[in-house]
Amino acid sequence: MIEEQSDNVENKDENVSMDNNISENLPIAEEQTNEDKKLPDDNNEKIDAEDLKNTITNNDARLEQLEKEHETLKSQYVRIAADFDNFRKRQSRDQDDLKIQLVSKALTAILPIVDNFERARQQLKPEGDEAQTLHRSYQGLYKQLVEVLKQQGVAPMRVVGQQFDPNLHEAVLREPSEEQNEDIIIEELQRGYHLEGKVLRHALVKVSMGPGQQISQESEEKDKVDKDIDSEGSISEEN
């Protein structure tokens, strides 16, 4: 009986010892299982790295393509903007030129009237109160015309004493001058006008030939007279 109890006690001790061993080994097994889970699969890691590398390469290529497209669109935009700006400036310039042409045509028709007023102003010498009153009346009208021309951008040329310029002047007469050098304007025969910096009407002028031209002309006339005298003398001797 005592032996059976003793055996039971020993069996219980063995069971307790086994239970303790199992309990002690259980956390270790769990840790190993967790570590096994944490350990990466070499094949999966290699595949993921290749995919990531391919993705980065594709993204870089796509980014480069988008940058090229951006530069192309930017260049097209800059070119279109420049073309539009040039078109706008050209349209504005054409409109200004057309406006000047129309105004020039109208003002050119008025200029002969202004010329007549200026000739009358220089030549007429009114006598008596009635004549002076009439003179002041049409001179007032002349001033109004001049003011209208001024408001439209018309400005008279100042030519006497200036160098002759065929772009501005038209030489009607040329004559020798002891006072002015050659190609200097000595008289204005008809006034010229500018419109917005452009020639509205050329000035009709008399231009100096210079003092040397007069001496040369006198020498030619003297030589001609001498030749005539010599010719007459030869005829007399023959007779």
Swiss-Prot record:
Gene3D superfamilies per the UniProt record, alphabetical: 3.90.20.20, Head domain of nucleotide exchange factor GrpE
Location(s), subcellular: Cytoplasm
Residue spans of biased composition, Basic and acidic residues class: 34-53, 219-230
Keywords of this entry: Chaperone, Cytoplasm, Stress response
Start and end residues of each stretch annotated as Disordered: 1-53, 210-239
Keyword Ribonucleoprotein among record annotations: no
Annotated GO biological process: protein folding
GO cellular component term of the entry, any: cytoplasm
Record InterPro entries: GrpE, GrpE_coiled_coil, GrpE_head
GO MF terms held by the record: adenyl-nucleotide exchange factor activity; protein homodimerization activity; protein-folding chaperone binding; unfolded protein binding
SUPFAM superfamilies attached to this UniProt entry: Coiled-coil domain of nucleotide exchange factor GrpE, Head domain of nucleotide exchange factor GrpE
Keyword presence, Nucleus: no
Membrane-spanning intervals of the chain: none
Subunit structure of this chain's protein: Homodimer.
HAMAP family given in the database record: GrpE (MF_01151)
Family, as annotated: Belongs to the GrpE family.
Described purpose of this protein according to its UniProt entry: Participates actively in the response to hyperosmotic and heat shock by preventing the aggregation of stress-denatured proteins, in association with DnaK and GrpE. It is the nucleotide exchange factor for DnaK and may function as a thermosensor. Unfolded proteins bind initially to DnaJ; upon interaction with the DnaJ-bound protein, DnaK hydrolyzes its bound ATP, resulting in the formation of a stable complex. GrpE releases ADP from DnaK; ATP binding to DnaK triggers the release of the substrate protein, thus completing the reaction cycle.
Protein name: Protein GrpE
